[in-house]
Amino acid sequence: MGKKTFREWQYFKLSITSFDQDVDDAHAIDQMTWRQWLNNALKRSYGIFGEGVEYSFLHVDDKLAYIRVNHADKDTFSSSISTYISTDELVGSPLTVSILQESSSLRLLEVTDDDRLWLKKVMEEEEQDCKCI
């Protein structure tokens, strides 16, 4: 029998937009805005269970975010962000998030050359975490 691999994390590459180029150009999206949007989406879709979804930011670059989600919560996370459109309270216009990529392997995340530095650091941290288990 083959060795079964335990997957603790699911990785997401996300994009946020208002679908209004003027609004998108006028507002930089920081990690706090991303977090507020994601928390609102999870709460709206799943109530207190959605608020309990474990996720963390690997990297935020304005309209792109790389997120790590507990593997057990990946379906809850992806369905809540795929169906949620925010109110205009965050940037003055409703925002929506698209999943650009989803992977159970950090190594398979598609990043630009500029992103290789933070990705390498995150991969090293995860390797250290695996050695501790």
UniProtKB/Swiss-Prot annotation:
It catalyses: Endonucleolytic cleavage of RNA, removing 5'-extranucleotides from tRNA precursor. It comes from the Eukaryota. Its main location: nucleus. One of its GO terms (cellular component) is cytosol. Keywords: Hydrolase, Nucleus, rRNA processing, tRNA processing. It is found in: Nucleus. Component of ribonuclease P, a protein complex that generates mature tRNA molecules by cleaving their 5'-ends. Also a component of RNase MRP, which cleaves pre-rRNA sequences. This is Ribonucleases P/MRP protein subunit POP8. It comes from Saccharomyces cerevisiae (strain ATCC 204508 / S288c). The gene is POP8.
